[in-house]
Amino acid sequence: MFTVFLLVVLATTVVSFTSDRAFRGRNAAAKASGLVGLTDKRQECCSYPACNLDHPELCG
């Protein structure tokens, strides 16, 4: 009975560890996607003088 308990604990730990790694990978992909989106907006904004004046932090 104790052996079954240890196997369940080990299996739970492995599943939890694998899920955490997958979550961090998806989170990194989402951040990279957000940075690409910001770069596109920066190019669009900096080409318009009114937007350039309103958002100098983007066009610096």
Swiss-Prot record:
The modification Pyrrolidone carboxylic acid is found at residue 43. The modification Cysteine amide is found at residue 59. InterPro entries: Conotoxin_a-typ, Conotoxin_a-typ_CS. Residues 47-49 are annotated as: Ser-Xaa-Pro motif, crucial for potent interaction with nAChR. The keyword Signal applies. The keyword Cell membrane does not apply. Keywords: Acetylcholine receptor inhibiting toxin, Amidation, Cleavage on pair of basic residues, Disulfide bond, Ion channel impairing toxin, Neurotoxin, Postsynaptic neurotoxin, Pyrrolidone carboxylic acid, Secreted, Signal, Toxin. Its main location: secreted. The cysteine framework is I (CC-C-C). Alpha4/7 pattern. This is Alpha-conotoxin-like 289. The lineage of its organism: Eukaryota, Metazoa, Spiralia, Lophotrochozoa, Mollusca.
